[in-house]
Swiss-Prot record:
Belongs to the endoribonuclease YbeY family. It is found in: Cytoplasm. Coiled coil: none annotated. GO terms for molecular function: metalloendopeptidase activity; RNA endonuclease activity; zinc ion binding. The keyword Transferase does not apply. SUPFAM superfamilies: Metalloproteases ('zincins'), catalytic domain. It comes from the Bacteria. Binds 1 zinc ion. This is Endoribonuclease YbeY. PANTHER family: ENDORIBONUCLEASE YBEY, CHLOROPLASTIC.
Amino acid sequence: MKIQIHNHTSFKIDSYQQLLIQLFSQIKENNQMHLVFVTKEKIKQLNTFFRKKNFVTDVLSFPNEFSFNPNLKDDSLGDVFICFEQAQLQAQKLLHSLEREIAFLVVHGFLHLKGYQHNNEEELEKMIHLQEKILKKINLERKK
């Protein structure tokens, strides 16, 4: 699967780009997605505008409407926005690497683009299981 990465922050993301390209090369799909790293201010603005939730969040996903209509040809699943600063805070709080946190969030966003939701505990557990299964491909699964 192809991943297009855009950095709209002042943070250096080169090493994370390589990690994510490696991760998504393991996913055998003919689609692509756009990943955009944004600031706290931008993700809060997006969250407020699109979800009516006025706070900073870690990841937002916006599926490409074409992906749900097989008659329209567009290989983009959609866009995933990651707040780099929020990912840093969460990695510190959860006591794992920033690489793992970013990969976890990107995979979470990817699964939302694929139609997965977590509106209840069962759906959340299924999603987390899938995230860990994907992250295991590059040895970033949660350590027990």
